[in-house]
């Protein structure tokens, strides 16, 4: 059975550092309000679904850990700039298609000498891209526009959601108020369950049937 085995977070929202282990069948996150339950789920979405990939860089204000931002403000330098690092370790069947794409011995900044399946996400300041920003940084300003967001597998290969090794369905009922929950569930299930080719075929067939239905109405 394929599943998420563990999660490692650095500098993301509420957590300066956090490690979570998951079991194979069911996991329940319990805690008080603002304890970070949603942050854990958001971290998984960020990695597997490449959340924020096309978002405006200003969103980083809300993603950086406030303690790391405060540490930078207290001692502003390129070295102390806030960053985000997330690892999702996976339990995959080695015989599964593309499984080797996620398998690696040395991965991430932790450089663990262990062979595992997984994906990592990193958001950090690009010194080459931000050449000439040193003075601004020393004044305590975070150059959000010069940050890069990267997704790579533990095999150090670029990760794209189309190669997602397992289906991941995230239903956030707090953000579905503008649409019926059932429709929201169906839309999310459709996106998560089927590959791009199947989704494209279904959308084209639906569009053709819709056009045909309107044509049959005989409207002027």
Where are these regions (language model features)?
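Electropositive, glycine-dotted interaction segments
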Residues: 94-218
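Generic hydrophobic, aliphatic-rich segments that mediate packing or membrane embedding
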Residues: 36, 44, 82-84, 117, ...
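A general secondary-structure signal for short beta-strands and their flanking turns/coil
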Residues: 2, 15, 79-85, 114-118, ...
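Short, flexible loop/turn elements at secondary-structure junctions
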Residues: 11-13, 26, 90-94, 125, ...
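Beta-strand secondary-structure signal
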Residues: 6-8, 19, 85-89, 118-122
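Generic marker of residues within folded, mature protein domains
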Residues: 10-12, 19, 76-78, 110-111, ...
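Pre-Walker A-like glycine/lysine-rich segment at the N-terminus of P-loop NTPase domains
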Residues: 1-53, 57-74
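Conserved P-loop NTP-binding catalytic core
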Residues: 43-113
């Amino acid at each position: 059975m394929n599943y998420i085995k563990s999660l490692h977070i650095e500098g993301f929202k509420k957590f300066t550092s956090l490690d979570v282990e998951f079991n194979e069948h069911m996991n329940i996150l319990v805690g008080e309000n603002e304890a970070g339950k949603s942050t854990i789920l958001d971290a998984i979405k960020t990695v597997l679904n490449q959340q924020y990939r096309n978002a405006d860089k200003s969103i980083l204000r809300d993603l950086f850990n406030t303690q790391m931002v405060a540490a930078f403000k207290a001692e502003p330098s390129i070295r102390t700039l806030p960053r985000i690092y997330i690892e999702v370790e996976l339990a995959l069947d080695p015989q599964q298609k593309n499984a080797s794409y996620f398998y690696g011995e040395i991965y991430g900044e932790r450089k663990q000498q262990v062979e595992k399946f997984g994906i990592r996400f990193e958001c950090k300041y690009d010194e080459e891209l931000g050449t000439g920003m040193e003075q601004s940084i020393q004044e305590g300003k975070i150059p959000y526009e010069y940050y890069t967001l990267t997704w790579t597998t533990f095999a150090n290969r670029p990760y794209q959601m189309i190669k997602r090794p397992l289906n991941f369905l995230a239903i956030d009922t707090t953000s579905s108020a503008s649409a019926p929950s059932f429709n929201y569930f169906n839309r999310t299930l459709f996106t998560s369950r089927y590959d791009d080719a199947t989704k494209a075929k279904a959308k084209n067939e639906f569009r053709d049937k819709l056009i045909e239905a309107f044509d049959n109405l005989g409207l002027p």
